[in-house]
């Protein structure tokens, strides 16, 4: 809206005054009038605001102009006062562009003025400071400023050129160059200065020539008496010329006098002095020369005295004492004294080192500073000391190595030596070489003698005492050879006697055991009959005494074999837990009789299947545990097995067994005696507890043979702990369903009652049982199992003792063997195991081999009981030459209802086999006419010849019977084709178990043979039989060649068997093993 335009009412309407004066119009137009007035008032108010804004804007513009004018005035005043540092401030927002332009122009002017002033000031300052050549820079200035700058630069340039020219000439004059003059253009006073300087240079050149001529003649050429001739000189130059000439004259007189004195001094005449009249410094020179002459006299006297003392009289340590000398003379004096001091130190150091060398001390060297020939002498002496030290070191080393340490063949390595030292070194090396040859020759002969070769003698050359020693050694060898021959004859006689002793013991054993076996057998049979109490007691005493005597005989035979070094150990596969468990089961009855707890614990982490001698391990455990039971009245006997902490080879394991008891203990002073032969802790113990004292001695020797050691800790009255270690190897044996021990039980049932194992663990165990050819039935509680027909279990596996107790309350499974399997089996109480019928145990998780090792003993004990039915009658052939043993065996067998035919030697047994068919043969090893081994070989050959395709059909089990306990009889009997082994005295239960097992196993194999014959079994049997050639061959090999290992019999009734499959043939193998492999193939 335009503020000058006034609001008006519509032309058709009345005016405001009309409306206000007319009430009627007022009432009609009141509202519109009010609106019109409001619009008018608002318009006026807007006009007022606009005017006020314009007024304020004008005031601000005036104020800004005044401020800018003030700032410009301040800058102008500063310029007038010579201050060019200030500028007009330019604000961020400038209201007037013209003012802004003025400010920029003024500031630019200030910059140019400041630059001009700085440049001109710089040039003026440089010229004032003597720095010529400077110029003022002109950066775009014009007008008067540019002209002023150019004039200043011209002035500076001219002044620079003139001053530099003058400076060059004066500098040349100062340096003695009088050939240059000033030739630069100059005007005014500068020109006058130029001419004056050039004139001065000419005069100086003439003066210098004349003065130089005089100086050269007098001072250089030594031509005295010359004068300087200079013309046209005045003032100072003339005076200077006169003074020079006077100086030359005086100098001539004085110098000639001084020359006379110095010439006399040079000729060694120190009596003359300078006498010319002198002044000033020449006088000082005169006095100095005269003083020099005096000092030279003193110096010559002192040096002469020192030289005579050091050089002639050999008195070291002297010094030249010259007073009041300075400069070169003082230096000469000091040098002379230094020479005397150095010479003294050097000679004394050389004397010290040579004295030390003379006294044998080669560690010192000349370390004093020296030069020239003295240095060469020093180096020569030090080199001599080094050579002597090397010589002494090498010679001492040879002497010490050869003479003290006994190191032969050493030579002194000394280089760079000549003369006597080289000769001595050569002599020492010759001595060492000769001594080496002689001693090594002596050593070779003594070494040969040590190795048993007494045919060689010392032939090396020697002299003196070495020759006497050589003779003595040769004589000693000769004497030793004779002694050895005598000792050899004596040893052979001793070995013959020892062999006779061993054979005597064997024969004695046989002769004693034969009637003793009869006594034991007959008393056992009598004890099984109706007897009175008195008769039973008497026969029991006889039976016990006979068994004790038999044990003593076995111990004596064992210690005899050990002493004769004929005792060896086997390396066969065996089950550790089964071996120890079986041994402790045989001792459990004795422990129960004495009301003792017999416990057993084996480290679950230790492997079960090992390679070693299980029979000897069992023997040691029986011995130690039996002793513990014997010497313990109350408490318990514990056997623990773990891995030893001692280090062995990587391929070996060290087994540690501890047998502890709460018995009588052993006194500390007796601990070292108990392992000696025929010794116990004291004699009273022998009388109270019985025994021969051989058990621990035999155990110690057996443990040593098995690579271990035995020790004991004991507290008297509280008990003992016997520890021993045995070195074994882990076994790689693999059980399958075709393994010999498992073949007879193929597809038999196994019940597993588990409350501790998870389902996953049970699945693994089920697969293992199936892999062994058995049928598992796994239940979580006894109620889920079918305990009646048609399922018939051979063994029952359990994982807790509580389950075993419940099973023994059930009549259906009361006599079935139990196998305990658990993650971590605590100590086993053998009383509980016997009462519950636990046959074996295993730790889980376990391998197939560990599982088979636990199952097989239970299966075999179950099969024996199943095959011991009295309704079964066997036809048995007994080959025995002793009448008592015949009657004993016949009574035992007939009592079981079996039919027995008796023959007296092996030949009769062979003929009987050819005539009749027998279920089993009991073959005595030693018989007249033909022994048991020879008879067995002939029987096996006849069986093979009778049916070369399938000799197994005609195979008759043969069980060896012997009272001979010497080493190798068992192995030999098995290797000859016998199926099992029974040691006398005959125990009815063990004998019947062995008979039943052999007959059962051979019947099972014959059945498998018949079932497999349709698959070309006979051809494969013939082809795979070792030694066979063709089906029609006369020597096609025997079934014995396919025989493996038969379990070794326990020597105590009730011990059971510990059968193991053997995967390699050796001298100890000889039973049914590979037949199963032939059937499988």
Curated annotation (Swiss-Prot):
Annotated HAMP domain residues: 63-118, 157-209, 249-301, 341-393, 433-485
Keyword annotations from UniProtKB, A to Z: ATP-binding, Cell wall biogenesis/degradation, Cytoplasm, Kinase, Nucleotide-binding, Phosphoprotein, Repeat, Transferase, Two-component regulatory system, Virulence
Every Histidine kinase domain range: 507-730
Keyword Phosphoprotein: yes
Gene3D superfamilies in UniProt: 1.10.287.130, 1.20.120.1530, 3.40.50.2300, Histidine kinase-like ATPase, C-terminal domain
Domain Response regulatory span(s) in chain numbering: 875-999
SMART domains reported in the protein's UniProt record: HAMP, HATPase_c, HisKA, REC
Name of one Pfam family that matches: HAMP
GO biological process: cell wall organization; cellular hyperosmotic response; cellular response to farnesol; filamentous growth; filamentous growth of a population of unicellular organisms in response to biotic stimulus; filamentous growth of a population of unicellular organisms in response to starvation; osmosensory signaling via phosphorelay pathway; positive regulation of filamentous growth of a population of unicellular organisms in response to biotic stimulus
Record PTM Phosphohistidine, positions in chain: 510
CDD domains referenced in this protein's UniProt entry, alphabetically: HAMP, HATPase_EvgS-ArcB-TorS-like, HisKA, REC_hyHK_CKI1_RcsC-like
InterPro entries tied to this protein: CheY-like_superfamily, HAMP_dom, HATPase_C_sf, His_kinase_dom, HisK_dim/P_dom, HisK_dim/P_sf, Sig_transdc_His_kin-like_C, Sig_transdc_resp-reg_receiver
Disordered, as annotated region: 1010-1081
GO molecular function: ATP binding; phosphorelay response regulator activity; phosphorelay sensor kinase activity; protein histidine kinase activity
The EC number(s) this enzyme carries: 2.7.13.3
Post-translational modification: The phosphorelay mechanism involves the sequential transfer of a phosphate group from His-510 (H1) in the histidine kinase domain (transmitter domain) to Asp-924 (D1) of the response regulatory domain (receiver domain). This transfer probably occurs between two NIK1 molecules, rather than intramolecularly.
A single GO cellular-component term on record: membrane
Disruption phenotype: Impairs the hyphal formation and attenuates the virulence in a mouse systemic candidiasis model.
Modified residues (4-aspartylphosphate): 924
Induction (free text): Expression is increased in opaque cells.
Record's protein name: Histidine protein kinase NIK1
Organism: Candida albicans (strain SC5314 / ATCC MYA-2876)
Upper lineage: Eukaryota, Fungi, Dikarya, Ascomycota, Saccharomycotina
Name of encoding gene: NIK1
